[in-house]
Structure formats: structure tokens, C-alpha cells
UniProtKB/Swiss-Prot annotation:
It comes from Bacillus licheniformis (strain ATCC 14580 / DSM 13 / JCM 2505 / CCUG 7422 / NBRC 12200 / NCIMB 9375 / NCTC 10341 / NRRL NRS-1264 / Gibson 46). It comes from the Bacteria. Induction: Expressed only in the forespore compartment of sporulating cells. This is Small, acid-soluble spore protein P. Coiled coil: none annotated. Its main location: other. Belongs to the SspP family. It is found in: Spore core.
Amino acid sequence: MTNKNDGKDMRKNAPKGAQPGQPEPLSGSKKVKNRNHTRQKHNSSHDM
């Protein structure tokens, strides 16, 4: 019973967090990719 409840709770949270989280990860993925590119170039002089 606990497992069923846990799955239902997680499933309910997944769709709710997936909707508002989808746009964020999409934007974040692009930002991270861009950051990685800029970071690599900056890493040369801005290693740490």
C-alpha cells in the first residue's frame, strides 16, 4: 500500500513539475551548452 501511495504521489508530482520544469530544462540545457562553449574559451585564461 505504501508503494502504491508513493508511486501515485510521485506520479502526481512528476506531471506537475514536468510542465513548469520542461521550459526550464529546455532553457537551462541551452544555457548550459552555451556556457560550456564560453566556459571552454574562458577556461584558457579563466581556468579556476
